[in-house]
Structures are given as C-alpha cells and as structure tokens.
Amino acid sequence: VTWFFCFINILNCKIMNFPILSSLILLPSIGALFLFFTKSKSENKITAKYVALFTSLVNFFLSIYLWFLFDQTTSAFQFVEDRIWIKGLINYKVGVDGISILFIILTTFITPLCIISVNNSVTKRLNEFLIAILIMETFMIGVFCSLDLVVFYLFFEAGLIPMFLIIGIWGGARRVYSAFKFFLFTLLGSVLMLVAIISIYWITGTTDVVQLYELGIDTKYQNLLWLAFFSSFAVKTPMWPVHTWLPDAHVEAPTAGSVLLAAILLKMAGYGSVSYTHLRAHETTNY
C-alpha cells in the first residue's frame, strides 16, 4: 500500500501540467468522432459497442486517477485550466472541488453501464446511438468542471441536444412528442439563466466563478438574480409545477437514455443550484 501511494505521488508531480480535465471532457468526443468516421467499417454492432465501451472505460479510470490525485484537505478548486477563448469576454476555465469531482466519477461510471445495456433496448442505428451517448458524456463532464458561467451554460444547454435525439429517435411510440416537450421545457427554462449571466457580466465585468466568489453583488440585484437561476434550475431538476415533461421523457426514452436522464442529467440542475445560486446572491440564499 505504501509503495502504491508513493507511486501515485510521483505521478502527481509529473501530471500537474497535464490537462487532465480537458482530457476527460474531450476523450468521449474523440471516441464519437472515431465511430462517425469509421461508420462504414464499424457496421458490426459488436465492434461499435466495444469502441464506445473502451472509450468510456478509459475515461472512468482517468476519473479514478483524478480522485487519487485530488487533495481532500483543501476546499480550493484544483487542476484548474484557464485559457482565453474570446479575449476580454470569455475564458475556457475548468477545475474541480470536492463536490464536482464526485459527479464526474458518477458520470464516467454510469456511461459504460449505459453502453453495456444497449443490447436489448436499441435495435436500430446503434452506431449513432453510441455517438450520442459519448457526446453527451462530454457535455455532462464539462458542466461539472466549468469555472466560467458562459462555459457552464454552453455545456449545460448542449447536453439537451443528444438527449433530445436519444428520446426522439430511439424512444417509444410517443417519442417525438416527448422529445419536443423535453427540449422546449428545458430550453425555455434556461432563458432566465442566460439573462442572469448577461446581467452578472454587466454588473461585475466577469463571468469567472472564482472572481465572483470574491467580488459579491449588490443586494438590490440579488433577489432577481437568485430568482432567475432558481427558476431555471427548477425546470431542469424538475420541481412542481414545471415537472410535467419528466414522466413523458422517462417513459419514452430507451433504457440507457432514461438512466442517463435520472442519474446525471437531472443532477446537473441540482449541482448548479448548490454550486452557483449562492455564488451570486449570498444574502438571498441564506434567507
């Protein structure tokens, strides 16, 4: 055991400059691209499934490795990567804390299980179904890693697209109705969050999560911002009375899609509510 932890410490020293979070985000998409460009060669369902399963398992073990490297004695964000995306406006900034790392591991653990389960629930266009799952894994991990509100929003909303396709193409008899209901409810629910993010940038001049923790926001704006974020997350959690899209989505989605929806996609809203709502409205949240 001692030798094992010594080995981990040595690797820790060498990996500090390695973009492990970006690797976790991008690896599923690389697997999806491989399946897309080798479609004619991977019509064999077993081959496509093994490629997707291998990709997701590598990501799972990479997340376990991240857990071993994670310093549990501090509450600070770790493995932070900060790169300019749009100068003076948006930075690609990712990092993890004690909450987000657990959701990342949950995501990488559930994804291979969903891929294993497709034998009985998916009988057509398996290649495209696996691509949708891998792309969705990229977006879900991106949500839990984001340290910029714009990046968080983009990953959050992008996750709707593969789930919309999973329900609409591979779902049950009422799949089209359920898919559009899911998409429209959750998309319209995000309008307030987008308005709130734009307002935060207008008030503070930044969407960087770490900087917002330090800056704070005038109390006269806090109630409105809190309400906007809470309303958006309430639709996606979902809470009564804006929960009516969920039963249809669960019933019509294939098994793997229903598992991803329940185990991870709904948790993204809860994570956002816990991690970000109080960030902009300390006093309102405490009240």
PLM region descriptions:
Residues S42-N44, I131, I135, F139-I217:
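Alpha-helical multi-pass transmembrane bundles of energy-transducing inner-membrane proteins
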Residues L33-K41, P112-V122, L165-R174, T237-D248:
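C-terminal ends of transmembrane helices
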Residues L11-S22, F34-I131, V210, E214:
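Transmembrane helix-loop-helix hairpins at membrane boundaries of multipass inner-membrane proteins
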Residues P19-L27, G98-L106, V150-G159, N223-F230:
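Structural signature of hydrophobic alpha-helical transmembrane segments
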Residues A281-Y287:
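A short, hydrophobic C-terminal helix/tail in secreted or cell-surface proteins
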Residues D71-N91, S190-A249, G270-R280:
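Juxtamembrane/interfacial segments at transmembrane-helix boundaries in multi-pass membrane proteins
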Residues D97, D148-I166, V235-R280:
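Functional transmembrane alpha-helices
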